[in-house]
Amino acid sequence: MAVCYKKLWKLLIDKDMKKKDLCAKAGISSASVTKMGKGGHVTTEVLAKICTALDCTMDDIMEILPD
């Protein structure tokens, strides 16, 4: 199964935030954001930190695509 984070990138644009701003606000590493940019998997802890920082749910930042 593949994970798509297009919703997250759109949300950042809507909030006028850069990826480095997300890292700082959520307390996550730039490596995690890079992984997400490449469609890689990150821990649920990272996703939870992003959701808390952006005041959203996981459905708002990601989508699981069937193989």
Annotated model-derived regions:
Residues 32, 46, 60:
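Residues in the helix-turn-helix
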Residues 55-67:
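Short C-terminal boundary/hinge segments that cap the last helix of small helical domains
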Residues 28-42:
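Recognition helix of helix-turn-helix/homeodomain-like DNA-binding domains
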Residues 12, 23, 51:
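The alpha-helix within a helix-turn-helix
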Residues 39-52:
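Short, basic-rich loop-to-helix N-cap that marks the start of a DNA-contacting helix
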Residues 13, 27, 38, 66:
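Residue-level detection of the helix-turn-helix DNA-binding "recognition helix"
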Residues 1-20:
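A short, Lys/Arg-rich alpha-helix, primarily the initiator
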